[in-house]
Amino acid sequence: MISLRLYAKQGFHSDLKEAYLRVNKLILVLSFVLLSSNGLAVQKVIYPSMENIRETRFQDLFEILEQALDITRPDFGDYELSPTPFPMTESRMLQEVKSGKIIDVIWSSTSPKKEEELRPIRIPLRKGILGYRISFIHKEHQIIFDQVNTVDDLKKFHVGQGIGWGDIDVYKHNNIPVSYAPYTTLFSLIGPRRFNLFPRGVNEIYKEYAVHGESNPTLTIEDGIVLYYPWPYYFFTSKENEKLAIRLEAGLARMIKDGSFEAIFNKYNADAIRKAELGKRRLITLENPFIPAETPLNRSELWFKPALDSLN
């Protein structure tokens, strides 16, 4: 009797141990399956925070970035998107993304130097609309700009730009004088003491006026001229972060195919395009020799094309 009880007790513990091992094995298998289905570990993606907390001029690019990462979850896994803990100038951002230590991705205009030092994702994020420029001017100077019709006319004026902006080289190449200062101070410097006009992308100027107009009562939007020079804006990663670059390329391609890329463009730009009335403005084209040969200018679906025939 005692031996039977002992056997039963031992058998019970043996069965319990076997069940425990089976459960552990099942947990390991499930963990492996879950890891496999999620791709790999969570991909951390750090982008630069804005110079001014009130700024919304890059909200569309953030939305594109987030959507490109979302749409590629099935193939590349989950991600964690976060800004840097402190703002940076464009020059600093370029340095940091190159090193890959603080920033993983930036958005910026392109140039041969940037494409040599960084890894470009060659899809123009705003369809090149930044190449169409309307200017902030002093409110008393519209009568002066009514007489401006050519690049030679522009050479009489100083253009304002942010520190480290690639546009500086474009204006210098066209022999237009340039002054530069931190972005947040540019709106208060327009006038005879510093510079005469501050060209902004069609998609930027109305939003910026809503933010900075009230605190700068002499600021106004010039109403007769549109400048143009090819100016694509890309995502850039470090050359070593090929995994993120490939993921962003895949995500943007899918967004173009499913229409979400165009939807974001229209969401953020349609109102500004309507307000700008580009067909009623005098078109002044500037040379931009700093566009890399690899720029996909032949892919018409990637570019914003206003009714240029209606421009004077």
Name the predicted role of every residue range:
Residues S36-S37:
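N-terminal signal peptide c-region/cleavage motif recognized by signal peptidases
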Residues S49-E51, F58, G128-I134, H138, ...:
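Periplasmic-binding protein-like
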